[in-house]
């Protein structure tokens, strides 16, 4: 597999990584319709764990079948497919080598009571990812949660193991819990902070939600206003989040968020493009 100058430039930012990890990143970046451009779209399918099967798949019954999601990622020309252990296992042989996969190694469910201390359980490991031929592991952290430190400690250990065997690391960094307000979960100061924490934890690919213009923290508001940090447009906010990830030296993917019509999806994609993000991860089936 040859790589393009755009992909080579991205890989050069990961100065400490071994050839195995860089090869797996290259597989993701060279896959699909955006292959070689430095942009990517990841299909994450962990809704069944998060919300239950009926809420996730009943509107589109073929989606109950794990093979559907592999096929969707392939037919749509996406960059990678991310899912929990059972979903990857169910299609690992049939689709081996056809689409880069990201094993989601922690998960949560909507039955738990945890408004101030949301967390996720570790549900798979690095050896599972190797056994299934995955290119990366994926892990969610909840900055702001009363259990955030435990989650950070877990991913620090998992990331070290993954990198040692040549796997890439994807961190979903979704602020929630603790003293954060609901609008604060997507506030620009909080999103940028959460993305920066994921970079500090060693993520190769960082996934956050598209930020709003809201500023949650009074201390941050003084800095944003005093330094005249531009957060007026979606593109300027994306640019600031990317800047917060080592000035663009890490791949930043933005969640697709709530379901949108075609115009809404295109507008969001343009903002991410104009802000220097590496595109979106869609979560709807």
Regions found by a protein language model. Give the residues of each.
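Conserved small/polar residues in nucleotide/adenosyl-binding loops
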Residues: 283-285
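N-terminal basic, low-complexity leaders that serve as flexible interaction/assembly modules and, when applicable
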Residues: 1-46
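Alpha/beta enzyme core
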Residues: 1-2, 35, 40, 47-252, ...
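A C-terminal functional module that forms or caps the active site or interfaces directly
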Residues: 257-263
């Amino acid at each position: 597999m040859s790589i393009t100058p755009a992909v080579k430039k991205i890989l050069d930012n990961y100065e400490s990584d071994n050839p195995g990890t860089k090869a797996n990143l290259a597989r993701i970046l060279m896959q699909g319709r955006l292959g070689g451009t430095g942009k990517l779209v990841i299909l994450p399918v962990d809704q069944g764990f998060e919300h239950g099967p009926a809420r996730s798949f009943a509107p589109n019954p073929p989606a109950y079948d794990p093979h559907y999601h592999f096929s969707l990622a392939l037919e749509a020309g996406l960059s990678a497919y991310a899912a929990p252990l059972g979903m990857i296992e169910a299609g690992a042989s049939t689709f081996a080598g056809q689409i880069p996969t990201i094993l989601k190694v922690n998960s949560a469910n909507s039955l738990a009571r945890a408004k101030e201390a949301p967390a996720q359980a570790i549900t798979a490991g690095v050896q599972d990812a190797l056994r299934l031929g995955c290119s990366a592991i994926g892990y969610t952290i909840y900055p702001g949660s009363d259990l955030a430190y435990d989650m950070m400690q877990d991913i620090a250990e998992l990331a070290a193991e993954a990198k040692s065997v040549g796997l890439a690391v994807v961190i979903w960094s979704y602020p929630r819990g603790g003293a954060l307000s609901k609008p604060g979960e997507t506030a620009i100061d909080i999103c940028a902070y959460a993305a920066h924490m994921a970079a500090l934890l060693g993520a190769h690919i960082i996934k956050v939600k598209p930020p709003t213009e809201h500023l949650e923290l009074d201390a941050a508001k003084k800095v944003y206003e005093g330094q005249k940090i531009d957060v007026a447009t979606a593109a300027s906010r994306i640019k600031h989040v990317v800047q917060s990830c080592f000035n663009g030296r890490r791949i930043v993917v933005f969640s697709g968020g709530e379901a949108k019509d075609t115009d809404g999806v295109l507008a969001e994609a343009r903002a991410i493009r104009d802000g220097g993000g590496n595109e979106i991860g869609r979560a709807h089936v």
